[in-house]
Structures are given as structure tokens and as C-alpha cells.
Amino acid sequence: MKLLEDRIKKDGQVIGTDVLKVDNFLNHQVDPDLMADLGHEFYRRFSNEPITKILTVESSGIAPAIATAMEFHKPLVFARKHKSLTLKDHLYTATVYSFTKKTSNEIAISRKFLSADDNVLIIDDFLANGQAVEGLMDIIAQAGATLSGVGIVIEKTFQKGRKLLDEKHVRVESLARINAFENGQVIFAPED
């Protein structure tokens, strides 16, 4: 998606050889107009699927996921990383490792928000090693729901996440695919 690639070139910051900082439009400060465009593009790519729920992990996946949910006119459910007094019983849970934070978290979704009747579209901000998506897939399986696909805002093709999902025959649609970071610059994969 050229609009997103242009925004990454303009405002993204490469850190080392494997981290892209996009905190001024995606995962700290959020550009609502860009999120609307991302949601529209995910809808365009997945509108042929019988989606009943949009699923993501808090917190950086929420903005593009809510924009997508608005396009589909379907509920967004986000997995919580921290249990609270209101989220402690009757849960689906999975453990996920955060590539950026280098920590593991148990994510949880209340059983009342996901059932075997659901067709789920996962939306997330990044695909690196695929841990967040795998955790959400585990929760979908626990609920007996159907995974309709995965929408990723930014995919790092040089990490193992896509390969992991391809091996499981999961449909993945990424709006920006990055092949490498070289000399502080983002090298994008050619669009299909």
C-alpha cells in the first residue's frame, strides 16, 4: 500500500537492523485518517470472507483493528495482556513473546466474546516472528471458532513470522512488506 509505505519513509525511524519505530502515526500517537485508510484496505482485501469478529492484541493493534471493525460493521475483541478484577474467570488464554519488548505475556479473552459460531479476522500492527498471531490463533482454536485470515499493517519479511503462518496455510495480507533495513533506510518488498 503506497500510502503506508510513503508514511513509513517519511516518519518511520529504523533502529538497528531489525526494529522500525512508527510511534508518531501507529503505536503511540495515532493518525486517524491513516487508520481509516488501513481499515478500508483490509475490508477491500477480506470483504469476501464471512467475518463476524475482528481480533487483535492490546495495545498497538487496537487502532488499525477498530478501523477495520468499523468497515466491516462487526465487533472488535482485543486480547488483554493484564488480568483485572473484571477479567479473571472464564477466559481463553495463550502465552505470547514480544519481539520488541523481549518479554512473554499471557493474553486473555473472555469466553463470552468468542464462540464456535465466529469467523475471525486477526489484525495486528507488525508481523515479525509471528508470536502474537500464533497466540491469537491458539485462542481462536480454544473457542472452536474459524480463522478467516490475518491482516498485518507492517510485515518484516526477513523474520520468520510469514513462513510460520504459510506453513499453517493461513491467509496473510500485509499492507507494507519490508525486506530489510539498510543504512537506516527501509527496503520494501515489491507489491504483488
Swiss-Prot record:
SUPFAM superfamilies linked: PRTase-like (SSF53271)
Chief location: cytoplasm
Residue positions binding 5-phospho-alpha-D-ribose 1-diphosphate: A128, N129, G130, Q131, A132
Domain of life: Bacteria
Annotated compartments: Cytoplasm
Binding residues for xanthine: L20, N27, K156
The protein's enzyme class: transferase
Pathway the protein acts in: Purine metabolism; XMP biosynthesis via salvage pathway; XMP from xanthine: step 1/1
E.C. code: 2.4.2.22
Keywords (A to Z) from UniProt: Cytoplasm, Glycosyltransferase, Purine salvage, Transferase
Coiled coil: none
Listed GO biological process terms: purine ribonucleoside salvage; xanthine metabolic process; XMP salvage
Known catalytic reactions: XMP + diphosphate = xanthine + 5-phospho-alpha-D-ribose 1-diphosphate
Cellular component, GO annotation: cytoplasm
InterPro entries xrefs: PRibTrfase_dom (IPR000836), PRTase-like (IPR029057), Pur/Pyrimidine_PRTase (IPR050118), Xanthine_PRibTrfase (IPR010079)
GO terms assigned for molecular function: xanthine phosphoribosyltransferase activity
Assembly and interaction partners: Homodimer.
Purpose: Converts the preformed base xanthine, a product of nucleic acid breakdown, to xanthosine 5'-monophosphate (XMP), so it can be reused for RNA or DNA synthesis.
Similarity comment text for this entry: Belongs to the purine/pyrimidine phosphoribosyltransferase family. Xpt subfamily.
Protein name (database record): Xanthine phosphoribosyltransferase
Organism: Lacticaseibacillus paracasei (strain ATCC 334 / BCRC 17002 / CCUG 31169 / CIP 107868 / KCTC 3260 / NRRL B-441) (Lactobacillus paracasei)
Taxonomic lineage of the native organism: Bacteria, Bacillati, Bacillota, Bacilli, Lactobacillales
